[in-house]
Amino acid sequence: MKESLAISSSKVLLVPYEKRHVNTYHEWMKSKEIQKVTASEPLTLKEEYLMQESWRHDHDKLTFIICRPTSTPITKVMAGTHDANRLLLGDINLFLFAAQDYNNCCIGELELMVAPLHARRQGYGRAALLCFLYYIQTHLDELMTEYCGSKNSKSKTMHLLYLRVKIHSENTNSIKLFESIGFRKVSDTADFFGELEFKLENCTEPETTTELLEKFGIEAYTKLPCIEEVSTGGFNDEQNNHSTAISD
């Protein structure tokens, strides 16, 4: 599942998190407001590059950078063009971990961030979330197989028990967004970081997600190859720890 694959729709474009995105991501995470609502500590640029490597290649993680949608239909995503810095909006992630007290089961934690203030409450977060959720549901067997190959899994088969998200109690927009697609609050009591947990049961079938995509006018869901135009380099060329959601 770590191939260079993008997800295109009428409302948003999702591309794999690559080294060329790290500088922009690093600038986003300097925001005190983002640090608060994502329960994050700022990382150095070098640490961000190491984190990108982890999110891109670890078997228990899946991440995409959220971009503005293309203005015309495309058949492939050109790296550095369709995901140029000016088009980047945030990120969306899935982290899998073993479920306690359940054999051969795991839980998926979602993380969503729309970083620029001007891009929030424009529908980008909802579009990214629904496209990402549909991707997970329609590639679940591959994701579970890959997770079984991670160092955190001791099983040869795996079942996704449910999806969860942690949202700062003051982040009412994100709470409304996740509740609007079926997530339900686990407890009214926030944790040490001021976060509330929300859970999506029955998360493995795409039918409900398909209905929500239609309801919110998110059309033309398509998987596209990402084509590298040039070598992007790494930390020496250019010189997250976040756990929750900022959205529309």
Regions found by a protein language model. Give the residues of each.
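Active-site rim helix/loop that mediates acceptor-substrate recognition in acyltransferases
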Residues: E41-T81
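Acyl-donor (CoA/ACP) binding surface of acyl/acetyltransferases
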Residues: K2-L13, Y17, H21, W28, ...
